[in-house]
Curated annotation (Swiss-Prot):
Additional free-text comment from the UniProt record: Few gyrases are as efficient as E.coli at forming negative supercoils. Not all organisms have 2 type II topoisomerases; in organisms with a single type II topoisomerase this enzyme also has to decatenate newly replicated chromosomes.
Site (Interaction with DNA): K458, N461
Keywords assigned: ATP-binding, Cytoplasm, DNA-binding, Isomerase, Magnesium, Metal-binding, Nucleotide-binding, Topoisomerase
Cofactor(s) required for function per UniProt: Mg(2+); Mn(2+); Ca(2+)
Main subcellular location: cytoplasm
Reported function: A type II topoisomerase that negatively supercoils closed circular double-stranded (ds) DNA in an ATP-dependent manner to modulate DNA topology and maintain chromosomes in an underwound state. Negative supercoiling favors strand separation, and DNA replication, transcription, recombination and repair, all of which involve strand separation. Also able to catalyze the interconversion of other topological isomers of dsDNA rings, including catenanes and knotted rings. Type II topoisomerases break and join 2 DNA strands simultaneously in an ATP-dependent manner.
NCBIfam families, per the entry: gyrB, PRK05644.1, PRK14939.1
The protein's name in its UniProt record: DNA gyrase subunit B
SUPFAM superfamilies: ATPase domain of HSP90 chaperone/DNA topoisomerase II/histidine kinase (SSF55874), Ribosomal protein S5 domain 2-like (SSF54211), Type II DNA topoisomerase (SSF56719)
GO CC term (a single one): cytoplasm
An example molecular function term from Gene Ontology annotations: ATP binding
Annotated disulfide bonds: none
Gene that encodes it: gyrB
Name of the top EC class for this enzyme: isomerase
C-alpha cells in the first residue's frame, strides 16, 4: 500500500468508526469472564489483547512492523506503525476516541464493519479489559503530525489526552503493568510462551515484521521474525528435521465473498498427519468447517487424479481421507469478516459457508498443481496407495487381535489389575514398568479406584513404525484395550475408562526412555486424552532419609534434590542415631506401603500433568528425538545436554 493511499484511508479511520455498546464495569470483579482466568494463562492473554489490535492494523494493510517489549519491571510495551488509534471526539461519549477505546467495554473498530474488514481480536474490547486489569497503562498515539498521550490507573483516566510532541510517523504505543491484586498467582511473563505465539503470528501474516525483546536483567534477548513465505515457511519450519517427498511446500490462496483461504502443505516419508488450522490468526485446535472443506477436497482431488492417470486400477477402491493424509503436514489459514467460534474451548470454526468456499478454492488450485507437476503428483498418489495397503493390513491385524481378546473391552488384558469403580471421573490407570514394581503397585493401591497395567521392557517406538506393526505389539494393544478408547479412526476420548492415565517408571535412564516411548505413543495415537488433561507422570521419591529402621522423610527428584537431602540430614542429625540415606533407583525397591505412601496416595503424592501448549513445536521435538534422522538429534543433545555426575 502506497503512503498516499495509506494517508487517505487513515483520514477515514476516525471516531465515527469506534462504536460503544456498553460501559466498562465488573471487569475487575469478574476478570475470568473476559480473559478466561487470572492464572499464568490469563496474564499472557493481556499481551495478545493488545497485540491483536496491532495485527488488525496489519490485516487491514496499514501496519508492517510490530514490536513487543518485556520491560525490566515485567510490564509490557507494544509498538506498531499503523494509523494510530483515532484521537478525535467520539460522538456517543463526548470523549476522545482513544480514551473511549481504553475505558469503555465493547468500544472498538470491529463493530459495524467500518473500521476493519477482518479482525483477530475485537479492537477496543481487549484494550479496555487490559486497562481495567492493570495498575497503570499509558498510550502514545502518533497521528496527524502530533504525539498524543494519555495515562490510566486501574482503568480510570489520570488526565485528559494531551499533545506531548511532534512526529512524522503514525502508529500506537501501549505500555501496561498487570495488577498483582488481580493476578495473584504470578505477574512474571514467560519469554518462551510469548515468543512462540509471536513467531506463529509472523508465519500467519506473510511479510509482517514482528519482534520480541526481553529487557529484564540477566534475560536480555531479542527475536525478530519476518516470513515472506508465510504459512509455506511455517510448513518448512515444522518439517525441518523430516525427510520430505518433495522440496518446496505446495501453496495455494484465493478469495471468495470477502473470505480468504490459504493452504500450505508438504508430504513427509513418515506416517503421521499434522494438519493445523487457523481462523483470523486464532489457532482452531478443534478444527471446523475450513478443515472439513480442505480434507474433502484433498481426498477427492487425489482420487480423481489417480483415476484419470491410471494410477488406481478400476477394480481398486478409492483412497480414504486417512490414506491421503498419511505423512501430510498442512497449515490452513482462513480470514473471515464474521467468524463464529464454537466447541468446548471456542476453538472450532463454525461458519457453514466456509466448507464450500475452502473446498472450491483449494480444489481448483490443487488440481492445477497436480496436472502441472506430474512427478510430485505420482509420489503423492503412491504414498496414499502404500498407506491404503498398510490400513488394510492393520484392519486384518485388528480383527485377528479382537478374536484373540485384543481390542474388545469385554475381554480386558489378563495382566490388568482393574479397579471396582466404573466412574471414569474418579478412576486411575497406572502404567507400571516391570512385574516387580507391578506387584508392589497392585498390593499397595486403592482397589476401589486405582488400576494397574504392568508393561514388560521397552515398547515399540511408534515414530518409526507403520500402523500394522503398531497393532501387532502386545504392550500397545493392552494399553488401548485397557483405556477403552478404540484406535485410529475409531478413537473416542469420551469412552475412556479412566480419566487419569499415570506413567509410573523408574527414576533412571531406562525409566526415562520407557516414559518417552509411552509419551510418543500417546502424542501420536491418543492425542485427545492428552488434550483433555488425562495424562500424568508419577513422581516417586529419589531418596529416603532413615533414622534407624524408620524412614522419616522422602526427597522428590528435582533441581534442588541435593539441597533438600542435605537439609533433611541436618534436621535428623541431632539425635543419638545418625540418619542414613536410602537411594531408590527403581520402583521395585519400595515395598507396597512405601509406594502407596509416596507415589499413589492422592493425599500425599506428587504428579505432573502433561499438556501440549504448542502442537507444532511438540511435533518437531518428537520427530527429532524419536525419528530416523541422527544429525538433528545429535545437535539437540549437544545444545541441551547438562553434564553432571551420574549415580549408576
Amino acid at each position: 500500500m502506497t503512503e498516499e493511499i495509506k494517508n487517505l484511508q487513515a483520514q477515514d479511520y476516525d471516531a465515527s468508526q469506534i462504536q460503544v455498546l456498553e460501559g466498562l464495569e465488573a471487569v475487575r470483579m469478574r476478570p475470568g469472564m473476559y480473559i478466561g482466568s487470572t492464572s499464568k494463562e490469563g496474564l499472557h492473554h493481556l499481551v495478545w489483547e493488545i497485540v491483536d489490535n496491532s495485527i488488525d492494523e496489519a490485516l487491514a494493510g496499514f501496519a508492517s512492523h510490530i514490536q513487543v517489549f518485556i520491560e525490566p519491571d515485567d510490564s509490557i510495551t507494544v509498538v506498531d506503525d499503523g494509523r494510530g488509534i483515532p484521537v478525535d471526539i467520539q460522538e456517543k461519549t463526548g470523549r476522545p476516541a482513544v480514551e473511549t477505546v481504553f475505558t469503555v467495554l465493547h468500544a472498538g473498530g470491529k463493530f459495524g464493519g467500518g473500521g476493519y474488514k477482518v479482525s483477530g481480536g475485537l479492537h477496543g474490547v481487549g484494550s479496555s479489559v487490559v486497562n481495567a486489569l492493570s495498575t497503570q497503562l499509558d498510550v502514545h498515539v502518533h497521528k496527524n503530525g502530533k504525539i498524543h498521550y494519555q495515562e490510566y490507573r486501574r482503568g480510570h483516566v489520570v488526565a485528559d489526552l494531551e499533545i506531548v510532541g511532534d512526529t512524522d510517523k503514525t502508529g500506537t504505543t501501549v505500555h501496561f503493568t498487570p495488577d498483582p491484586k488481580i493476578f495473584t498467582e504470578t505477574t512474571i511473563f514467560d519469554f518462551d510462551k510469548l515468543n512462540k505465539r509471536i513467531q506463529e503470528l509472523a508465519f500467519l501474516n506473510r511479510g509482517l515484521q514482528i519482534s520480541i525483546t526481553d529487557k529484564r536483567q540477566g534475560l536480555e534477548q531479542t527475536k525478530h521474525y519476518h516470513y515472506e513465505g508465510g504459512i509455506a515457511s511455517y510448513v518448512e519450519y515444522i518439517n525441518e528435521n523430516k525427510d520430505v517427498i518433495f522440496d518446496t511446500p505446495i501453496y495455494t490462496d484465493g478469495e471468495m465473498d470477502d473470505i480468504t483461504v490459504e493452504v500450505a502443505m508438504q508430504y513427509t516419508t513418515g506416517y503421521h498427519e499434522n494438519v493445523m488450522s487457523f481462523a483470523n490468526n486464532i489457532h482452531t485446535h478443534e478444527g471446523g468447517t475450513h478443515e472439513q472443506g480442505f480434507r474433502t477436497a484433498l481426498t477427492r482431488v487425489i482420487n480423481d487424479y489417480a483415476r484419470k492417470n491410471k494410477l488406481l486400477k478400476d477394480n481398486e477402491d478409492n483412497l480414504t481421507g486417512e490414506d491421503v493424509r498419511e505423512g501430510l503436514t498442512a497449515v490452513i489459514s482462513v480470514k473471515h469478516p464474521n467468524p463464529q467460534f464454537e466447541g468446548q474451548t471456542k476453538t472450532k470454526l463454525g461458519n457453514s459457508e466456509v466448507v464450500k468456499i475452502t473446498n472450491r478454492l483449494f480444489s481448483e488450485a490443487f488440481s492445477d498443481f497436480l496436472m502441472e507437476n506430474p512427478q510430485i503428483a505420482k509420489r503423492i498418489v503412491e504414498k496414499g496407495i502404500l498407506a491404503a495397503k498398510a490400513r488394510v493390513a492393520a484392519k486384518r491385524a485388528r480383527e485377528v487381535t479382537r478374536k484373540k481378546s485384543g481390542l474388545e473391552i469385554s475381554n480386558l488384558p489378563g495382566k490388568l489389575a482393574d479397579c471396582s469403580s466404573n466412574n471414569p471421573a474418579e478412576t486411575e490407570l497406572f502404567i507400571v514398568e516391570g512385574d516387580s514394581a507391578g506387584g508392589s503397585a497392585k498390593s499397595g493401591r486403592n482397589r476401589e479406584f486405582q488400576a494397574i497395567l504392568p508393561i514388560r521392557g521397552k515398547i515399540l517406538n511408534v515414530e518409526k513404525a507403520s500402523m500394522d506393526k503398531i497393532l501387532a505389539n502386545e504392550e500397545i494393544r493392552s494399553l488401548f484395550t485397557a483405556m477403552g478408547t478404540g484406535f485410529g479412526a475409531e478413537f473416542d476420548v469420551s469412552k475412556a475408562r479412566y480419566q487419569k492415565l499415570v506413567l509410573m517408571t523408574d527414576a533412571d535412564v531406562d525409566g526415562a526412555h520407557i516414559r518417552t516411548l509411552l509419551l510418543t505413543l500417546i502424542y501420536r495415537y491418543m492425542k485427545p486424552i492428552l488434550e483433555a488433561g488425562y495424562v500424568y507422570i508419577a513422581q516417586p521419591p529419589i531418596y529416603g532419609v532413615k533414622v534407624g529402621s524408620e524412614i522419616k522423610e522422602y526427597i522428590q527428584p528435582g533441581a534442588d534434590q541435593e539441597i533438600k537431602l542435605q537439609e533433611a540430614l541436618a534436621r535428623y542429625s541431632e539425635g543419638r542415631t545418625k540418619p542414613t540415606i536410602q537411594r531408590y533407583k527403581g520402583l521395585g525397591e519400595m515395598d507396597d506401603h512405601q509406594l502407596w505412601e509416596t507415589t499413589m496416595d492422592p493425599e500425599h503424592r506428587l504428579m505432573a500433568r502433561v499438556s501440549v501448549d504448542d502442537a507444532a513445536e511438540a511435533d518437531k521435538i518428537f520427530d527429532m528425538l524419536m525419528g530416523d534422522r541422527v544429525e538433528p538429534r545429535r545437535e539437540f543433545i549437544e545444545e541441551n545436554a547438562v553434564y553432571s555426575t551420574l549415580d549408576v
